[in-house]
């Protein structure tokens, strides 16, 4: 008998069962692990940093807040504000909608970015599962999920995580067509 056992009484340890579940479901496992890590990073940065972590976040937050309040005019920032909003609308429209619904809170933008980051991890796992065994598909998804730069860029209010999610999804569509 082992001195300390994690045996659950139903045929294996809890860790082994969790790993078996993740290997069986690499796409959803990668998504939820990635989302959990990014959400934790977003919450931590909100608690530890007053303001924004990366200066460009402020631009997206400001133009989306103004747009959600109906105050983003063509005169704002000499026309650049409206131009930036329009040229990044794939990111600023959902952010503006969140601000309109729930108020202009930075965490909403961070959760939007975190979701895009999690989609990237899931897409990587799905793409890998097209060509590799499930264990390797999980490894691909978790690589994206835990890669430090991916965590950073998808836990701040920047459009980069959306771009990676769209690129990964495009690769996935091409692989399955």
Model-predicted regions and their roles:
Residues 1-43:
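Start-transfer (signal-anchor) and selected internal transmembrane alpha helices
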Residues 39-47, 56-84, 90:
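Extracytosolic helix-loop segments that constitute the early lumenal/periplasmic catalytic or substrate-binding loops
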Residues 69-70, 90-112:
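Juxtamembrane segments of multi-pass membrane glycosylation machinery
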Residues 123-126, 163-177:
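Specific aromatic-rich, kink-prone transmembrane helix
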Residues 155-161:
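Short acidic/glycine- and proline-prone juxtamembrane loop motifs at membrane-interface regions
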């Amino acid at each position: 008998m082992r001195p300390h056992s994690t045996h659950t009484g139903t045929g294996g340890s809890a860790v082994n069962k969790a790993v078996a579940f993740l290997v069986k479901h690499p796409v959803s496992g990668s998504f939820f692990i990635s989302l959990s890590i990014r959400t934790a990073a977003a919450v931590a940065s909100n608690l530890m940093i007053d303001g924004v972590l990366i200066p460009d976040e402020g631009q997206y937050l400001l133009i989306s807040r103004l747009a959600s309040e109906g105050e983003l005019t063509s005169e704002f920032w000499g026309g650049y504000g409206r131009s930036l909003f329009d040229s990044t609308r794939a990111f600023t429209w959902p952010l503006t909608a969140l601000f309109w619904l729930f108020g202009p809170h930075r965490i909403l933008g961070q959760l939007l970015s975190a979701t895009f980051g999690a989609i990237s991890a899931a897409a990587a796992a799905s793409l890998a599962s097209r060509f590799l065994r499930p264990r390797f598909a999980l490894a691909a998804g978790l690589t994206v999920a835990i890669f430090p730069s991916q965590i950073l860029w998808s836990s701040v209010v920047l459009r980069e995580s959306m771009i990676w999610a769209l690129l990964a999804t495009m690769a996935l569509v091409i692989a399955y067509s």
